[in-house]
Amino acid sequence: MSSLEISSSCFSLETKLPLSPPLVEDSAFEPSRKDMDEVEEKSKDVINFTAEKLSVDEVSQLVISPLCGAISLFVGTTRNNFEGKKVISLEYEAYLPMAENEVRKICSDIRQKWPVKHIAVFHRLGLVPVSEASIIIAVSSAHRAASLEAVSYAIDTLKAKVPIWKKEIYEESSTWKGNKECFWASNS
């Protein structure tokens, strides 16, 4: 086997790396093209409301599929200011039975409108410091248009219909924010 000698701060002068992986002649299992084409994967919706810090990597891993060429994400984070006030953190509360039900409806609506494979909606509850994610929505699909449109629909509809409340915590005060996009708060 050929090898490459590397000298850098990461390796000693004697480090040798293979240029190609070793060949394994007698593989225990070699999937045929037919096996790979017939892979059927059940679609899934993963919904989670949690006080734990959200991870973009963990949420995006939930929607990966060999049948899909696109994963679209929306990540909402706490910004450090609002109308000239310094924001320290946000605090979220939700009416969980209704919130979970409404998010399930959003997932169902998405599946009626676009050919998507997997959907994950994670929303943080409790305190969310500046720069941390409060919501992550991930959608996978065969092609990008479906997942991009589905993610946009998901965040817009979530803000309009899901009973989640946000308190902005400033340096010297705090205030519960009304969601202007929420259907039950509109004056019409």
Curated annotation (Swiss-Prot):
UniProt pathway: Cofactor biosynthesis; molybdopterin biosynthesis
UniProt tissue specificity: Highest levels are found in heart and skeletal muscle. Lower levels are present in brain, kidney and pancreas. Very low levels are found in lung and peripheral blood leukocytes.
Pfam families attached to this UniProt entry: MoaE (PF02391)
Catalytic activity: 2 [molybdopterin-synthase sulfur-carrier protein]-C-terminal-Gly-aminoethanethioate + cyclic pyranopterin phosphate + H2O = molybdopterin + 2 [molybdopterin-synthase sulfur-carrier protein]-C-terminal Gly-Gly + 2 H(+)
Keyword Phosphoprotein: yes
Residues that hold substrate according to the record: 143-144, 159, 166-168
Listed EC numbers: 2.8.1.12
InterPro entries named in the record: MoaE_sf, MOCS2B_euk, Mopterin_biosynth_MoaE
Modified residues (Phosphoserine): 20
GO cellular component, one term: nucleoplasm
GO molecular function: molybdopterin synthase activity
Top-level enzyme category: transferase
SUPFAM superfamilies according to UniProt: Molybdopterin synthase subunit MoaE
Localization: Cytoplasm, Cytosol
Record flagged with keyword NAD: no
GO biological-process terms attached to the record: Mo-molybdopterin cofactor biosynthetic process; molybdopterin cofactor biosynthetic process
Keywords: Cytoplasm, Disease variant, Molybdenum cofactor biosynthesis, Phosphoprotein, Transferase
HAMAP family for this protein: MOC2B
Family: Belongs to the MoaE family. MOCS2B subfamily.
Further remark: This protein is produced by a bicistronic gene which also produces the small subunit (MOCS2A) from an overlapping reading frame. Expression of these 2 proteins are related since a mutation that removes the start codon of the small subunit (MOCS2A) also impairs expression of the large subunit (MOCS2B).
Quaternary structure (record): Heterotetramer; composed of 2 small (MOCS2A) and 2 large (MOCS2B) subunits.
Disease the record associates with this protein: Molybdenum cofactor deficiency B: An autosomal recessive metabolic disorder characterized by neonatal onset of intractable seizures, opisthotonus, and facial dysmorphism associated with hypouricemia and elevated urinary sulfite levels. Affected individuals show severe neurologic damage and often die in early childhood.
Protein purpose: Catalytic subunit of the molybdopterin synthase complex, a complex that catalyzes the conversion of precursor Z into molybdopterin. Acts by mediating the incorporation of 2 sulfur atoms from thiocarboxylated MOCS2A into precursor Z to generate a dithiolene group.
Stated name of the protein: Molybdopterin synthase catalytic subunit
Protein's gene: MOCS2
